[in-house]
Amino acid sequence: MLTMNRLLLVLLAAVALPAHANWYLDNESSRLSFTSTKNADTAEVHRFLVLHGKVDAKGLAEVEVETDSVSTGIPLRDERLREQVFQVRKFPTAQINAQLDMRPINDLAPGAQLELRLPLTVSLRGKTHSYNAELLATRLDERRFQVVTLEPLVIHAQDFDMAPDFNALRNAAGLSAVSLSVPVGAVLIFTAR
């Protein structure tokens, strides 16, 4: 009987773990991408290769973006973005923070989805700006959930005092125009630990 009680206790603890665990971002399965527009009609999609993040038991979500990991497919452009726009030596990371109610997410059956509309903050180059995000949370299995943007989050260069840097980038690249509004999309996978 003692063995049966121990087995029951272990099973209950295993089932309860995701509801009380911290959730950690799976960088390999996650993606944060952005779209740049130049010369008024040429749009290109880029991404950041290194992300860190977690959602704690109270629902505080934090994603850290290593801005040095920007990847556009063109090394010279990557270097210009690192130096002129992100200023990675002074500001090596950007942060995204939000407060989630984890109860509905934890209650989802595998494969079930939940639309979320919530405020989040983006901190970039020492400035912080708030946005309203439309997200879709999907419970993948007992130990993983996914959050994707239903609509791109449009980041404006002016919100982070970056307009002069975008113009410097435009001049360095010999372009007639570079959009100061940048749509950002995300697919984030979190795993319970």
Question: At which residue positions do the language-model features occur?
Answer:
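Low-complexity, acidic/polar, glycine-enriched regions of mature
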Residues: A21-R193
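Positively charged n-region of N-terminal signal peptides that target proteins for export
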Residues: M1-L7
